[in-house]
Amino acid sequence: MKIIELKEGEAVSLKRSGLHGSEAEIATVNTIIETVKKEGDQALVDYTQQFDGVELTDLCVTKAELDNAYRHIDQPVLAAIRQAIANVRAFHEQQKAKSWFQTAPDGTILGQRVTPLDAVGVYVPGGKAAYPSSIIMNVVPAQVAGVKDISMVSPSGKNGTLPPAVLATAAELGVHTIYKLGGAQAVAALAYGTETVRPVDKITGPGNKYVALAKRAVFGDVAIDMIAGPSEICVLADEKANPAYVAADLLSQAEHDEDATAVLVTPSRKLAEAVQQETARQLATLPRKEIAGRALEQFGALYVTASLAQAIEVVNQLAPEHLEIATEEPLALLGRVKHAGAIFLGSYSAEPVGDYFAGPNHVLPTNGTARFASPLSVDDFVKKSSIISYSKTALAENGKAITELARLEGLEAHARAIDIRLEDM
């Protein structure tokens, strides 16, 4: 990782992998979607064979596979999954929005009705690792919101099934509609349905570039959570921070994939040098050191600022997915941070605490979109309808003002819809 010294007022230009596919990649995704729409299940079987090298005999996970998963999962792992589910559920219960109504003296009733989505599809990535935490973070808020129909897609392994931890987590959450599908073809199936796959109203969950491009392509026909890019971490630290902790946390995101971003922002050159050395030392023994090493080489940086105030400005410019504040008084700085998906305060709030266990959602805005976007929440799985009930008295009192506005905009039929009622009063 390179140390980059910033002058006071100097803007940061951080290289990120981005979310935009090439013309060829976009064309490939569009072809996959259209083929799934036309050929249904057969397209899913063909694409799974082509891209994953797996010959599917059944698109759906069976009850026998779910039962078998419990026989192959370690009990400490299962206990950890159950506790994580409980923590995430308790946090998201606090987010539930309630319908509300108010009645005015003239009899007008105004309000907002909150109702859950009918059907949601959760994409759970496979490939380089198993991700039961993705199931928890996507399914739990949907359940808290009241969604009744939750299905899941995840790419099958070469053995024709999914990892035991993935299946057991789904079973613990009561998700039994699970399709052995991944990639753009899985997104297309959830969006438009096939002979086997039921279409849904919203698709959530992370995936590779082709999954992200497919979600972007089907948006509008169905809802999506967000177009999530590679994982990011930014550590804001002062000279009191433990360089070993900081290095470990940077590596915790760098090991996700080669496009992950890992950044330190500090006014302390001494800390930056110590973190640089510590990162190299810890990287050498990581099982995924090739992946993490490429990420740090491409998208890693150690920024040294002229002051702590400038460091905070840099953080707000970056608008990172994960922000750790590793300073002597982290709470004192919290109010000055404007843009971050999740904020971890203090030396013991390591980013993996939020990834797996604490309760807040780990599906977060990336690529600087924390400037305007928020973490996945219960709100993402509900709809809000405005309720308007005008009384005769209210319309008589306000009808003239309504027609004035309608005619100002040149919409005569709007005005007449009010006039015809006023004439009957």
Swiss-Prot record:
Q: Which UniProt keywords apply?
A: Amino-acid biosynthesis, Histidine biosynthesis, Metal-binding, NAD, Oxidoreductase, Zinc
Listed under catalytic activity are:
L-histidinol + 2 NAD(+) + H2O = L-histidine + 2 NADH + 3 H(+)
Cofactor stoichiometry and binding remark: Binds 1 zinc ion per subunit.
Q: What's the top EC group for this one?
A: oxidoreductase
| Protein origin, superkingdom | Bacteria
Cofactor dependence is on:
Zn(2+)
List GO BP terms, alphabetically: L-histidine biosynthetic process
Provide the residue positions that the database annotates as binding NAD(+): 123, 185, 208
* Positions contributing to Zn(2+) binding: 253, 256, 355, 414
* Protein name, per record: Histidinol dehydrogenase
Protein source organism: Shouchella clausii (strain KSM-K16)
Q: What is the lineage of its organism?
A: Bacteria, Bacillati, Bacillota, Bacilli, Bacillales
